Amino acid sequence: KEKLHITYNQLENLVNHFIDYLLNNFKKNELFKSPIAIHSSANLCSTISMLACAKLGITHCVLFNDLSKEAIEIRCKLIKCKILITASDDKDFTSKIKQIKKKLRIKVLRFSDSKNSNVSVNTDNFYKKKNIIKKFKYIFFESNKNSFILFTSGSTGEPKGIVHSTGGYLVYSKYTCSEKFNISDKTIILTASDAGWINGHTYALYGPLSLGATTIILEKPMMLLNPNILKEILFNL
């Protein structure tokens, strides 16, 4: 039940550090020609990854934590991704990813507090980064530029990737948060859905951040293993 408090300034710094990592460790055609897949949808790593991609104008696709190997593989194949970002240390998942990596010829970027050689970004060190790295300026895009892809469940056949544009999506995110939920920079919001679903994109991340609100992001396994955690959070807000 660890708590991590991140200010807007600290979040920007972490995003810039991750952008620097991406630009220094991957070729441009790997980063910009195909969408990036982001697994591990319920933690800070996915938040940083999503915002880094958005800032660089890289179309990204968040994959729900509990998807099977087959479900992950078909989504990676459909978007033709060359990079998969994950924060999972699960041994079973790691073996599955190795198979997907080999079959689809993708590179895997792993966030972890582990010290093993498969880890790309050590979170113990990464989250403690205090030094201010050069600020990466936001790039101006056409409003209809693809921002991210989110897949349907696939329960009625092959999953379908729903493309969300930069301008239209951000306008509706900010509008609904402001006008329907009365969210402002004084608001603390808890959206229990993770980024594997549209509510996690809109009401845990992009909408609240666009209005300067404080958003609480839950690591999903914590809630599933101990439902009292949700009650504890609500009583301590």
State each model region's role.
Residues S40-A42, I58-C76, S88-F93, D194, ...:
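ATP-dependent adenylate-forming carboxylate-activation enzymes
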Residues L170-I188, I198-L237:
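Conserved AMP-binding/adenylation subdomain of ANL enzymes
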Residues K1-T7, K115-V119:
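AMP-dependent adenylate-forming
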Residues Y21-L67, L190-A195:
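Conserved AMP-binding/adenylate-forming
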